[in-house]
């Protein structure tokens, strides 16, 4: 059974094709510059050279058509006919508090997404266009929506409410929603397996650090608090987003410069964060390289980012009311940047967080779950490569089968202690050939 997952942005459509019967990813790719000149698809199949082709995509419909034609192409495709695709899963950023779990897309569901798109103006319109485009191109199969906000619907009111007039919540749905929920769900469930705990007994703090970044306090296996707010702008310092700042800053700059609300929105979302501090860098690799070459602003950006992460670590230890079982790093930077991890954990020994420098240096792989804490650290420090697409695929499959439920009453395949990601296992084998010492930090240990 073939399941297609789509992640539609304003100018891109990312996709993955999963063979559920074989439990294997058979293709991934992205169409970039959608709605712009020079639209191009990059199609990746393990064991083959990447296929790159330009093709006009004035709308998301043409982008989905391009994906389907590529998947079924006699030379570069992976399926013989579109009819082999039995369902499509769609990532949806913002569903407010309307859904606590993934759903099959119906006209009423789409209307709900439209009704809350003001809460996610940078993402939701594109998500909706992507769903409509895919339904037009592949009309005969179920389409399912997997929402970033659903995971966080377990937060208590004291965590999600803002100290603003209650009327704003009641009339305009102003509250903390949180994002990266699919990633947090996956890493929380995998952490429980690694820790050999039941999900409902697991208390951890997760740092999802990519270009977008947020943290989640997981108490008794569910989201208890998170750093992003009504939009993804709040919280950690990100590639182009400012994260936490005094709201009056916007009013001050508007009075001083005459900037509009739209100008401020664009600046705080797309011209701030690491880019705003350094004036030129968004990628952490560039920041770290420049910092090591003496760039003072790159050093400042790095120090500000990790200071913010440490503050949230401390806050969430307090919110848990107990020592966490583990700190978990995930997403591109969290999985690969040992400098950020080391600095984020520095000075937290009094909280029971003890990083092993050698292990941390070794942990640069997306093909294995690793442990980078010292052997005597009261709090374990884990690096768990996220797999949002697998959650999307599994939710979609379970919805088709009628077996799906909210995550506290549903068991995922990756919660099985014997679960193996075939592609990552093959990648780990190659990694170990290059660096045998990696076996000493993989969990469970491979050198014993």
Swiss-Prot record:
Annotated EC: 2.7.2.1
Source organism of this protein record: Treponema pallidum (strain Nichols)
Protein keywords: ATP-binding, Cytoplasm, Kinase, Magnesium, Metal-binding, Nucleotide-binding, Transferase
Cofactor: Mg(2+); Mn(2+)
Assembly and binders: Homodimer.
One GO MF term attached to the UniProt entry: ATP binding
Catalytic activity, reaction form: acetate + ATP = acetyl phosphate + ADP
Ligand binding (substrate): 91
Co-factor: note: Mg(2+). Can also accept Mn(2+).
Principal cellular location given in the protein's record: cytoplasm
Site for Transition state stabilizer, residues: 180, 241
Biological role: Catalyzes the formation of acetyl phosphate from acetate and ATP. Can also catalyze the reverse reaction.
Binding-site residues for ATP, renumbered to this chain: 14, 208-212, 283-285
Record protein name field: Acetate kinase
PANTHER family the record matches: ACETATE KINASE, ACETATE KINASE-RELATED
HAMAP family (UniProt xref): Acetate_kinase (MF_00020)
GO cellular component: a single term: cytoplasm
Active site: 148
Signal peptide positions on this chain: none
Pathway where it operates: Metabolic intermediate biosynthesis; acetyl-CoA biosynthesis; acetyl-CoA from acetate: step 1/2
Protein family per UniProt: Belongs to the acetokinase family.
GO terms classed as biological process: acetate metabolic process; acetyl-CoA biosynthetic process
Gene giving rise to this polypeptide: ackA
